[in-house]
């Protein structure tokens, strides 16, 4: 895979998209101005013609070194999804930048056409289908200053994800119990 094999899908409602200036000219770019992030990304995939798709936010900047590294990762892991690490404790990627083959998208299905959190839900479906997520530190890509999301929206997102994937609750509880068992001194539990 080379740069020319990638289409960058950028959802935006801004007249000037900062990200475009750091995308090499040999790449294809599809800017989508649909209402929700999920719908815009899905429309971008439909309009793209390349084997590889990169989701990118409209307010980031890539370095040539980052793109070279991502291409190397993709060539070594063609059946994985590569992206920026989510916010702890989430094991999922964020769509500020995410790269994958079109065939993976087709297998997982389109993103939910919501405003926020669509990539987390998509990554959950991806892992359930056996795809590996390769996380790159978020700091690898410059993110221009912007307004932060509201805490209440993050809580709504968690409840929405749990309503779609209730098995996450059980998996989370199992992980907590496992960590407690592995990290606690046996002395703590003696009477």
Question: Where do the language-model regions lie?
Answer:
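Glycine-rich, basic loop-to-helix element that forms the pyrophosphate-binding segment
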Residues: 34-48
């Amino acid at each position: 895979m080379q740069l020319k094999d990638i289409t960058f899908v950028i959802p935006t409602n801004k007249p000037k998209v900062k990200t475009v200036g750091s995308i090499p000219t040999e790449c294809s770019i599809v800017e989508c101005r649909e209402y929700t992030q999920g719908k815009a990304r899905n429309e971008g995939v439909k309009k793209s013609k390349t084997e590889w798709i990169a989701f990118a936010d409209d307010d980031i900047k890539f370095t040539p070194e980052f793109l070279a590294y991502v291409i190397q990762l993709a060539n070594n892991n063609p059946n994985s999804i590569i992206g920026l690490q989510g916010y702890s404790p989430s094991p999922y990627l964020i769509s500020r930048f995410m790269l994958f083959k079109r065939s993976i998208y087709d297998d997982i299905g389109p993103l939910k056409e919501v405003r926020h959190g669509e990539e987390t839900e998509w990554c959950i479906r991806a892992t359930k289908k056996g795809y590996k997520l390769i996380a790159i530190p978020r700091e690898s890509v410059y993110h221009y200053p912007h307004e932060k999301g509201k805490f209440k929206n993050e809580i709504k997102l968690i409840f929405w994800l749990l309503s779609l994937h209730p098995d996450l609750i059980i998996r989370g509880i199992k992980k907590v119990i496992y960590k407690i068992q592995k990290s606690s001194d046996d002395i703590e539990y003696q009477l």
